Amino acid sequence: MYRIGELAKMAEVTPDTIRYYEKQQMMEHEVRTEGGFRLYTESDLQRLKFIRHARQLGFSLESIRELLSIRIDPEHHTCQESKGIVQERLQEVEARIAELQSMQRSLQRLNDACCGTAHSSVYCSILEALEQGASGVKSGC
């Protein structure tokens, strides 16, 4: 059995993170010492690592709750359910990547249009393009 600080250290999170997951009903603490300290098991450590890894992959708390539910009661769930949750997250990531690539292209056009000299920025193409909403990036300074 582990106290909250020990569990936090092993899972590389803070005790406040564990308390937060408890409030979100993603972690439970059924055992306490006579002094009122929470005690956790190896199973709690595995659950906490599961949650932490899912958070690192960007899953929402709701998705993690669903995945935990599937993990806790695998006999009443299918792999298709887990895969559906992962596919949804994958689509979100792909959309974000496309958005970032579009942003990168826009920034590259702004960068390429500017001569970057030490002259006054009175006629800076970057500033002009940003003012116009980047609708027409002109070359020059």
Curated annotation (Swiss-Prot):
Which terms are listed as keywords in the entry?
A: DNA-binding, Metal-binding, Transcription, Transcription regulation, Zinc
Q: Which Pfam families match?
A: MerR_1
DNA-binding residues: 4-23
Q: Which GO terms describe its biological process?
A: DNA-templated transcription; positive regulation of DNA-templated transcription
Annotated Zn(2+) binding lies at C114, C115, H119, C124
Superkingdom:
Bacteria
Gene3D superfamilies in UniProt: 1.10.1660.10
Enumerate the InterPro entries for this protein: DNA-bd_dom_put_sf, MerR-type_HTH_dom, MerR_fam, ZntR
Q: Which GO terms describe its molecular function?
A: cis-regulatory region sequence-specific DNA binding; DNA-binding transcription activator activity; DNA-binding transcription factor activity; zinc ion binding
Sequence ranges assigned to domain HTH merR-type in this UniProt record: 1-70
What is the role of the protein in this entry?
Answer: Zinc-responsive transcriptional regulator of zntA.
Can you state the subunit structure given in the record? Answer: Homodimer.
What PANTHER family does UniProt report for this protein, alphabetically?
Answer: HTH-TYPE TRANSCRIPTIONAL REGULATOR ZNTR (PTHR30204:SF92), REDOX-CYCLING DRUG-SENSING TRANSCRIPTIONAL ACTIVATOR SOXR (PTHR30204)
* Protein name according to UniProt: HTH-type transcriptional regulator ZntR
Q: What is the organism field in this record?
A: Escherichia coli (strain K12)
